[in-house]
């Protein structure tokens, strides 16, 4: 057994890269679907660097000694400049609060544009819905595993992504308002 501490230098493969929880040498590892942002950061702070932007960092090669408080170094030695947090990060949301299982895990086929979620899936005037009776087995399994994140609304339907009809179990409308429950934090 090896201690599986996820950090910036980790770029694992397969299911364990994201779903293996941190454990001590004496504990048996456990799996989770509540994948925290550190798991995303190991891979997604490179190339597209979306994880850096999310937490208010930008990779740079220039260092301004007069404003040294605005700079830092990552564990792998890269120089970063501190910037404002992404609005979703500032609100305390996790990466998986927006990114769906279909967008992250895929459909088993290669796609040019794998991303499932769009801003309008939460922020459009009228959201897309799917009747609960039309949930696929994989989709129904998630609602069974995490019933606290499962919200229904109008006539037994669920809000879904426009692109692929992926259920957004943690998003609902109530009394004229729209709410999202954090998949990790559980906060509304």
Describe these PLM feature segments.
Residues 1-24, 31-188:
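C-type cytochrome heme-c attachment and multiheme electron-transfer modules
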């Amino acid at each position: 057994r090896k201690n599986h501490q996820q950090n910036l230098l980790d770029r694992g493969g397969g299911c364990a890269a994201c779903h293996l929880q941190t454990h001590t040498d004496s504990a048996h590892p456990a799996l989770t679907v509540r994948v925290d942002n550190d798991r995303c950061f190991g891979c997604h702070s490179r190339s597209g660097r979306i994880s850096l932007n999310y937490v208010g960092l930008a990779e740079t090669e220039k260092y301004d000694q007069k404003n040294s408080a605005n700079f830092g170094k990552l564990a792998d030695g890269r120089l970063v400049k501190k910037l404002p947090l992404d609005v979703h990060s500032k609100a305390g949301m996790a990466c998986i609060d927006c990114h769906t299982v279909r967008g992250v895990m895929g459909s088993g086929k290669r796609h040019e544009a794998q991303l499932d979620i769009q801003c309008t899936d939460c922020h459009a005037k009228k959201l897309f819905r799917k009747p609960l009776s039309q949930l696929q087995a994989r989709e129904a399994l998630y609602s069974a595993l995490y019933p606290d994140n499962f919200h229904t609304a109008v006539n037994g339907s669920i809000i879904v992504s426009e692109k692929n009809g992926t259920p957004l179990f943690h998003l609902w409308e109530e009394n004229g308002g729209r709410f999202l429950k954090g998949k990790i934090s559980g906060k509304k």
